[in-house]
């Protein structure tokens, strides 16, 4: 029994009253029928009627005497199950039913009165239109009162800048009125809603209207819809549509969650009625409905405050344009990255600001876009101006007293100097002064502050309490920590406001003795360290001159400026200065990140600890380099990297190192970067790592043998007699020798008779390399032995050649059957060497991911007496084919694909390769049977078939590659580039020449096509000129002969001489050549133009001039010149050849391309391969004089660019001579 009626009968049971029975079983059945026929969610009522019948027959429903109680019970039951509060059962013996439409029909005057009292409008401050609608009228009423609404209300709202649509009091309306409300605010013909009506079982789609009375408000101006908890029905639907079309911002309360259409329907013949929603809305915009749940506003406020809130939102939105204008101006005039400004100015105004409802939204939107476009964290837009705590104005020189005692006292106050144990200098000052002040105080500073610390070995500069100040003294202070002999570039400042770029260098001369560039300097920082103090710390770090210790600095630079926006609480911080360090890196704000991050209070102790550690760095760097020189497999690389490491130390590159872990990280990075070998690695370990020494392999017992074989090897014979072998570790050669007979019996013998073999190495991470020759030997013949690779061992400085073995257990797979190896990023070490060996020797096709690039042998060595260890590959593998060291980056497969797709690709390639011999046979037969020159075709076919056993075809991986290979071989054998093989995928078969017929234009298009395709002219001396760049089929030509004569031929036929320009003619069908040639001979005298031999029909065809032509002929007497070029091809060459051979035309230009008669295209078996074969040839020429493949030699060979001028010159001379 469905839960609805379980709930209903249970309620009836507990409310049952034995006396005065009111309930009749038919009442429930009648109610069910009403719901089934009218409820707008019929799918929720499946099985209801049958359940009721069973409940009634079973006596589960008792009698209730009170009708109101019974109505409440029914209401509770249907609402509880269907979760629909709109379903209400009532007992109303005096209900007379709804009035008929006729009784509700109103006069025009009554309609206007109704409209005037249900629609109100106003123009609010800020040119905001206000329209309140309490009843959405239907289509019929709109037709009657529409002009009145437009003229008296809408036209007055149209000039407003924004519109508030107030639906807070709209509780009723007609569905047919929804498109009218929405259409005035949106574009035409947009699908806005779908309404299902249950009584008629129909769905009606609502669209915005294509035409309206009056103008549309448009989709640009802002619209705000006001709602309340009383907004109901049709008004809810309109609100929902406008919200989800992003056309309006909904402000107010969540709506009632009513219905588009509810009806109170009588239940049977009783006095009970049920209110049922008979229609439902399903939005095409969201796929959901607002019914029951209501429309949630974009901005939630009390209904009484909604209008004020809407006006506030519109005020903010109206400011967007003003804010954008100000922002663009500020950026254009101030942003330091001037090259990024055009993109910003173009992008920002075109963003979608439809969701902006507050200044916070404007700030968030614009800030996100600014960050995305510029990637500049300094460029920040905020909704409230945060007051930055900036240092006070720096002391200026004019404010400094002249009294020496007071100057000395000032220096003593500002600077704190002491000498710490270990000859460590300590200097603290809490503000940067202007360089003019430093100049005035310099003698006192040098004597009192600087001279005592110049004799120290290391110096701690305490900036933890330094709030910055003027940065003009920073270059001077930096100069004290550099060598004075060299002018060093410190940084570059680009000031956008001043449009200046300053290169700042160290001072060559300073007062007093410089500290120099070799001693240790340690700068202490805190969150308070700001402006000039940050610049100093940043530059000391970027110049590799100091180790920074403490907290990340404040990020309070003087490179940016805050610009407020007029009339708002918004402001934008714009970097007006770009600070570029000596490495060319831009400092994009943010605090300076210390090399050692500790709490400010702990920074001094940490500095002392690092000072004690730093002397040990160079021995460790040198020791690491020495280990490389001794053990790394490639000596020349080892010496280079060792030198780089030591040079970096001498240049201060290790000052950022603060402990052994950071030293290990930096050494690893430097070694890998400079060697290109990712296997070099330095690491820190408190305890000495266990170094596994080579142990003699344990030979498994017979009991262990089966387990090992099952664990390491997985085999299967796949459909098509394809073997599959997976093994996940390379075992030692001694184990292989010991278990060889069992391995052959249990594994190998099941695979050796397969036609091809897939070896799955995707999960093989390596193992012992000693077994590689054994495994490889199974895939080569016993003789000759194959040189697989050479292993060079640095520890012994010897190379060992690795060869296949003359004898193996069991039968070999041989050297001819295909092998496919599947790889992944996990494939490593010995598995890589096995894989690469077979790839180098073209013995296998590799499919999958590039392998990991793990070394065959890696030694681990301790660096001095420290806790640092370095792993160094001490063997390299040298290719037997190229003689070069194998790359350390791993093996790249022939077919790179994700590892999980490798098996599918392997099957696809296997299937293709099984077809290759048949494809070759088919292609050869097509050439032999159809090639225009029979002897050549037979010779090419014979040689082509012999190529099938070549390695090139055995390594084909795709039909594309096969097509390219066949094409190259056929053209190489035939010396005919018109004999082609192409790959044409399924989705491109509409482009197959000679297979898919060309689309013939409609007759209506022919006239324009002819005018476009033919170019005619008449030069001086009555010389005609005609050019066309392609020959048409004779059938097509016959269809348009009248048009050709009218629009082309008549313009040149009566001239005294004619130039036919074939320089750009690429050929086409040859069937129209007799027609064209006939116009240049005399009528009534047939002329044999050519003999054409067709190989497909093995017949010779004589080509004659035609007796009947449309229009008059040019005749055989008037001079005719044909222009040619190296582009002239195919049918154009045949025409030129005929006219020259018969002496009818004089040919001027270049030798033609040497094409052929139009070839035929043949499909090769069930592949996507097609052969294009020349099947016809001209047979009139003497042997060896045909134009096919050689071209037509002109009578006058000159450049095609000058051919026309030369032709005109020749014809003018001839015509002049005749006169």
From Swiss-Prot:
GO terms for cellular component: cone matrix sheath; cytoplasm; extracellular region. Glycans are attached at residues 94, 116, 201, 499. Sequence repeats lie at residues 127-301, 423-598, 721-897, 1022-1198. Expressed in retina; at similar levels by both cones and rods. Weakly expressed in brain. In embryos, expression is restricted to the central retina. InterPro entries: ClpP/crotonase-like_dom_sf (IPR029045), Tail-specific_protease (IPR005151). Glycosylated. SMART domains: TSPc. The keyword Chloroplast does not apply. It is found in: Secreted, Extracellular space, Extracellular matrix, Interphotoreceptor matrix; Cytoplasm. Residues 127-1198 are annotated as: 4 X approximate tandem repeats. Keywords: Cytoplasm, Extracellular matrix, Glycoprotein, Receptor, Repeat, Secreted, Signal. One of its GO terms (biological process) is proteolysis. It comes from the Eukaryota. Residues 1-22 form the signal peptide. Belongs to the peptidase S41A family. IRBP shuttles 11-cis and all trans retinoids between the retinol isomerase in the pigment epithelium and the visual pigments in the photoreceptor cells of the retina. Also involved in the transport of fatty acids and retinal development. This is Retinol-binding protein 3.
């Amino acid at each position: 029994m469905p839960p609805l009626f379980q709930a209903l009968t249970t309620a009836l049971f507990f409310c049952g009253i034995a006396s005065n029975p009111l309930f009749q079983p038919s009442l429930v059945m009648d109610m069910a029928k009403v719901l089934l026929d009218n409820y707008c969610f019929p799918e929720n009522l499946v099985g209801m009627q049958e359940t009721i019948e069973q409940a009634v027959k079973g006596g589960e429903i008792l009698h209730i005497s009170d009708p109101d109680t019974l109505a409440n019970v029914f209401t509770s039951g249907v609402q509880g199950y269907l979760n629909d509060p709109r379903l209400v059962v009532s007992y109303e013996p005096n209900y007379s039913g709804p009035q008929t439409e006729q009784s509700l029909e109103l006069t025009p005057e009554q309609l206007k009165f109704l409209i005037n009292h249900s629609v109100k409008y106003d123009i609010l401050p800020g040119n905001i239109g206000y329209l309140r609608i309490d009843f959405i009228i239907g289509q019929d009423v709109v037709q009657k009162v529409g002009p009145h609404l437009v003229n008296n209300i809408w036209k007055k709202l149209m000039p407003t800048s924004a519109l508030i649509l107030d639906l807070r009091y709209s509780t009723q309306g007609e569905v047919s009125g929804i498109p009218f409300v929405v259409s005035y605010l949106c574009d035409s013909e947009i699908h806005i809603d779908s309404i299902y009506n249950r009584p008629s079982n129909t769905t009606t789609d609502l669209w915005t209207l294509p035409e309206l009375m009056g103008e549309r408000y448009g989709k640009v101006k802002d619209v705000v819809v006001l709602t309340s908890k009383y907004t109901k029905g049709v008004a809810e639907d309109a609100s929902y549509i406008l919200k989800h079309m992003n056309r309006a911002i909904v402000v107010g309360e969540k709506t009632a969650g009513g219905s588009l259409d509810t009806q109170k329907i009588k239940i049977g013949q009783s006095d009970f009625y049920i209110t049922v929603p008979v229609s439902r809305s399903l939005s095409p915009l969201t796929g959901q409905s607002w019914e029951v749940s209501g429309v949630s506003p974009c901005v939630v406020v009390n209904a009484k405050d909604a209008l004020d809130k809407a006006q506030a939102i519109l005020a903010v939105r109206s400011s967007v344009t003003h804010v954008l204008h100000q922002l663009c101006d500020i950026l254009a005039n101030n942003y330091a990255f001037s090259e990024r400004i055009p993109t910003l100015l173009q992008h920002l105004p075109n963003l979608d600001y439809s969701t902006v409802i507050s200044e916070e939204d404007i700030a968030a939107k614009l800030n996100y876009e600014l960050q995305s476009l510029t990637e500049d964290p300094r460029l920040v837009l905020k909704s409230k101006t945060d007051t930055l705590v900036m240092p006070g104005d720096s002391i200026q020189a004019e404010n400094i007293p002249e009294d020496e005692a007071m100057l000395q006292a000032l220096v003593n106050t500002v600077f704190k100097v002491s000498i710490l144990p270990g000859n460590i200098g300590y200097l603290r000052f809490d503000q940067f002064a202007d360089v003019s002040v430093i100049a005035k105080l310099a003698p006192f500073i040098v004597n009192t502050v600087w001279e005592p610390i110049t004799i120290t070995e290391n110096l701690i500069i305490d900036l933890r309490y330094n709030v910055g100040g003027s940065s003009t003294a920073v270059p001077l202070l930096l100069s004290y920590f550099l060598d004075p002999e060299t002018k060093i570039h410190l940084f570059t400042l680009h000031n956008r406001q001043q449009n200046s770029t300053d290169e700042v260098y160290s001072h060559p001369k300073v007062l007093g003795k410089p500290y120099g560039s070799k001693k240790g300097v340690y700068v202490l920082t805190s969150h308070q360290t700001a402006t000039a103090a940050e610049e100093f710390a940043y530059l000391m770090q970027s110049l590799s001159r100091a180790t920074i210790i403490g907290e990340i600095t404040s990020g309070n630079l003087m490179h940016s400026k805050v610009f407020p926006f007029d009339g708002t609480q918004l402001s934008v911080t714009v970097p007006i200065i770009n600070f570029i360090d000596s490495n060319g890196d831009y400092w994009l704000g943010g605090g300076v990140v210390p090399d050692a991050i500790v709490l400010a209070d702990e920074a001094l102790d940490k500095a002392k600890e690092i000072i004690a550690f730093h002397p040990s760095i160079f021995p460790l760097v040198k020791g690491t380099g020495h280990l490389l020189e001794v053990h790394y497999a490639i000596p020349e690389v080892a010496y280079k990297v060792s030198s780089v490491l030591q040079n970096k130390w001498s240049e201060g590159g290790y000052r950022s190192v603060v402990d052994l872990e950071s030293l290990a990280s930096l050494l690893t990075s430097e070694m890998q970067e400079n060697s290109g070998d990712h296997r070099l690695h330095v690491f820190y370990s408190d305890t000495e790592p266990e170094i596994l020494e080579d142990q003699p392999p344990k030979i498994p017992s017979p009991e262990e043998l089966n387990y090992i074989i099952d664990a390491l090897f997985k085999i299967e014979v796949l459909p098509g007699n394809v073997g599959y072998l997976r093994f996940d570790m390379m075992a030692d050669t001694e184990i292989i020798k010991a278990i060889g007979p069992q391995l052959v019996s249990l594994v190998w013998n099941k695979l050796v008779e397969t036609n091809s073999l897939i070896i799955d190495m995707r999960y093989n991470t390596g193992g012992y390399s000693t077994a590689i020759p054994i495994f490889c030997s199974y895939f080569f013949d016993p003789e000759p032995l194959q040189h697989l690779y050479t292993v060079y061992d640095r520890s012994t400085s010897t190379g060992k050649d690795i060869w296949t073995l003359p004898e193996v257990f069991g039968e070999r797979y041989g050297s001819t059957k295909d092998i496919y190896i599947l790889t992944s990023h996990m494939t490593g070490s010995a598995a890589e060497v096995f894989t690469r060996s077979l790839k180098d020797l073209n013995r296998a096709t590799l499919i999958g991911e590039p392998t990991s690039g793990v070394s065959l042998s890696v030694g681990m060595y301790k660096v001095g007496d420290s806790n640092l260890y370095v792993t160094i590959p001490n063997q390299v593998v040298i290719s037997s084919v190229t003689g070069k060291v194998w790359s350390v980056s791993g093996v790249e497969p022939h077919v790179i694909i994700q590892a999980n797709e490798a098996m599918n690709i392997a099957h696809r390639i296997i299937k293709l390769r099984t077809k290759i011999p048949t494809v070759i046979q088919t292609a050869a037969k097509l050439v032999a049977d159809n090639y225009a020159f029979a002897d050549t075709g037979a010779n090419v076919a014979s040689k082509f078939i012999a190529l099938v056993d070549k390695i090139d075809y055995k390594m084909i991986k795709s039909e594309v590659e096969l097509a390219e290979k066949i094409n190259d071989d056929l053209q190489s054998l035939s010396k005919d580039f018109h004999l082609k093989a192409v790959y044409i995928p399924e989705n491109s078969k509409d482009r197959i020449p000679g297979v898919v017929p060309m689309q013939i234009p409609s007759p209506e298009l022919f006239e324009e096509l002819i005018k476009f395709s033919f170019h005619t002219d008449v030069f001086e001396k009555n010389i005609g000129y005609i050019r066309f760049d392609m020959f048409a089929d004779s059938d097509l030509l016959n269809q348009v002969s009248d048009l050709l004569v009218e629009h082309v031929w008549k313009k040149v036929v009566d001239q005294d001489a004619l130039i036919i320009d074939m320089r750009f003619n690429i050929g086409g069908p040859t069937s129209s050549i007799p027609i064209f040639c006939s116009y240049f001979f005399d009528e009534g005298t047939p002329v044999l133009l050519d003999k054409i031999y067709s190989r497909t029909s093995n017949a010779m065809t004589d080509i004659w001039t035609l007796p009947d032509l449309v229009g008059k002929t040019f005749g055989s007497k008037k001079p005719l010149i044909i222009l040619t070029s190296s582009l002239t091809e195919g049918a154009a060459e045949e025409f030129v050849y005929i006219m020259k051979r018969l002496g009818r035309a004089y040919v001027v230009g270049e030798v033609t391309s040497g094409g052929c008669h139009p070839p035929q295209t043949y499909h090769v078996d069930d592949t996507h391969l097609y052969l294009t074969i020349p099947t016809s040839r001209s047979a009139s020429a003497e042997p060896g004089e045909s134009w096919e493949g050689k071209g037509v030699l002109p009578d006058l060979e000159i450049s095609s660019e000058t051919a026309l001028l030369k032709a005109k010159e020749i014809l003018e001379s001839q015509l002049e001579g005749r006169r």
